[in-house]
Amino acid sequence: MLILAFESSAKAASVALCRDGELLSEYTQCTTLTHSRTLLPMGEDMLKNAELTLNDVDLIAVAHGPGSFTGIRIGVSMVKGLAWALDKPCVGVSTLEAMAWHGLSAGGLVCPVMDARRSQVYNALFSIENGRPVRLTEDRPISLDDLAQELGSYDWPAFLAGDGAEMSYDYLTKKGVDCVLAPENLRMQSAWGVAMAARDKEPGTADSLLPVYLRLSQAERERLERLEREAAEKKE
């Protein structure tokens, strides 16, 4: 199976091409350009250099969240459009599950962390069993205090990956948590991880592909807070 995978949940844009679990090509770009300008041209260029076309692709995969609200919307919308136009199956995978594939060489406990702001990280925990990540928790926003307490119950050191890894490492080590910071080449999100995670997912259609945000955006939170204030003022 030839999988074309996209990752746009954070600052870097990443595109990968995998056939039956083997990485054929991966492009990553981390610039000031928006994902809406870089993601699709990267994919088209990569396919061209591999002497392939979009019609050769069997499955289109994308990291559907959690992560940057804007980045996720761009990636999911683009893949929905491609899948619809080409009549191809597509699938969304957890950004955190995709990152867990970076911990294969470390083994033990893999702890992807993304900076969720508001004193929280997006996180899930995985163990490495038989050469693949096995989920231990659901994706969730969690405070570093709560994460430190949870990691303390495991016998393995936690392998930290993701754009929140360095921040989390500094905090967790001060709390006495046994953890390892992923090397820079394994720390950031990658489309290779998306492709690997997609192999076990049930393919869907463009209509079934949806973003996963885990919590409201800042604009939605502010709107809800404003409505609550207005409702309280009316009661007075």
Protein language model features and the residues they cover:
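N-terminal beta-alpha supersecondary unit
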Residues: 1-66, 141
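Residues at secondary-structure transition points
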Residues: 30-38, 69, 73, 77, ...
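Stable alpha-helical structural segments in soluble proteins, enriched in small hydrophobic residues
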Residues: 46-50, 85, 103, 191-202
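Conserved hydrophobic/aromatic positions in well-ordered beta-strands
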Residues: 16, 122-126, 212
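DPxDG-like acidic metal-binding loop motif
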Residues: 61-90, 95
